[in-house]
Amino acid sequence: MMTEDTRPLVQVVAGILLDQNGRYLLSSRPEGKPYAGYWEFAGGKVEVGESDFQALQREFEEELGIRILVATPWLTKVHSYEHAHVHLHFLWVEADQWTGEIQSREGQKWAWQKAGDFTVAPMLPANSALLRSLSIPRQLQGRLNSGLSGQNSMGEYYVAPYLSAQHQTASAVLLDFADWQQGKLIEAPSVWPIIENAEQWQQVQNADAVVWKVANEAAAKQVVDILAQGVAMPLIVAAPESMVSIYREQWQSMGVHAVLTDNDIEAV
């Protein structure tokens, strides 16, 4: 039986930094630090008085000699290490949102890696689920009723409805909340429950990713509230154009993984 970690949470930021080819930057932990030699997303502890973004800027300048111009919240994770109980805040940095030449200022190694095809090891334990999340495209097209598609650095990524003929060969499967709640067993690499409100959100916290079907203003605002708290897995919002046109920028600035326009969803 696992015991609750009662140590104070240490606030830590890490950057998901991309290059022009859509690859992610990983660096090794330098000698003298816990887990020396393990690979991670660069970052470090948030100091008193710093925002997450300010801490990320400082850490990347100190460790790698590059300047972060813009970063967007993505996922948050809590992880218990032997040396610390950490609250990780991952910030997303696109290729045009940083400048400079990468330097190894702490004697660490660094490497550009493709989502789904990471070639460096060992990885820091807190990052295992994160690597799976990175393979999910941030741009998806389609309909919840017929399936979603996108591209990652490894190629085509298809998400099939549970009852479709393609669900056994898809990258992920969509599952109605009622079926998820009943514990329906699905043979698939990944299962994404479809939810419609904040109450259901609380019941899907062990999912690989979650699709939130937004059909009204109340649900749209609930998404904003949940994103403000931080999400631990990729959240994909599906909504009709009337909702997307109003909320897309706000959702994206707060850390939604993808916004899908689905006009089969009737606004109510």
List PLM regions with ranges.
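Nudix hydrolase/Nudix homology domain
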Residues: Q103-A160, I236, S253-T261, I265-V268
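Active-site-adjacent beta-strand/loop module that shapes the phosphate/pyrophosphate-binding cleft
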Residues: K77-E101, G116, N127
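A short coil-to-beta-strand element that immediately follows conserved catalytic motifs
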Residues: R67-T76
